[in-house]
A protein has these predicted regions:
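Beta-rich carbohydrate-recognition modules and glycan-binding surfaces
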Residues: 1-163
Length: 163
């Protein structure tokens, strides 16, 4: 099976369907931005603050539904900053819960392989008593940082695929 491109970043990429969601939605003051750098990589950077019970920044991408029945994993080429992030997916964009996979990063380019069945359901940080993600449908992906500490971060993305 051929890989399913979810997003391939380049200098001409349209970021209109990528949206920042920071802890301001619950009174926090963390700040982040998402843009294309001079090499055409998606760049997610910002500052996490714990003020006002905050502590997270996220960038999400919403798209037309993808059926991933014969797919076994997500493959993400990225360059991190040595910090831990979460990859989140939603079966339907209106779902309140996401399926989550935490992963560490290095300061070098790396490819993270995420087995679909290891994405677990959670809502507001609490694991839910539901089955893990099954790949039947995909309408949203999110990258989130929220390590319960104040920190700056910078995360580059080259490509996101399902294989």
């Amino acid at each position: 099976m051929h890989p399913i491109k979810i997003f391939d970043f380049n200098l001409k990429s349209d970021l209109a369907n990528w949206k920042i969601i920071n802890d301001a939605v619950m009174g926090g003051v963390s700040a982040s931005k998402f843009y294309l750098n001079t090499n055409g990589n998606g760049t997610f950077e910002g500052n996490i603050s714990l003020e006002n019970n905050g502590g997270f920044c996220a960038v999400k991408h919403v798209f037309e539904p993808l059926i991933l029945k014969s797919v076994t994993h997500f493959s993400i080429r990225l360059k991190g900053d040595g910090k831990k992030y979460q990859f989140r997916v939603k079966t339907h964009r209106m779902d309140s819960h996401s399926y989550i996979f935490p992963f560490p990063t290095t300061t070098d380019w790396q490819t993270i392989e995420i087995p679909i069945t290891e994405l677990y359901p959670a809502f507001r940080g609490q694991k839910l008593n539901l089955p893990n993600y099954d790949g039947s449908n995909l309408e949203e992906i999110t990258f989130l940082i929220g390590n319960k500490k104040e920190e700056t971060f910078r995360f580059l993305i080259d490509s996101i695929e399902a294989k």
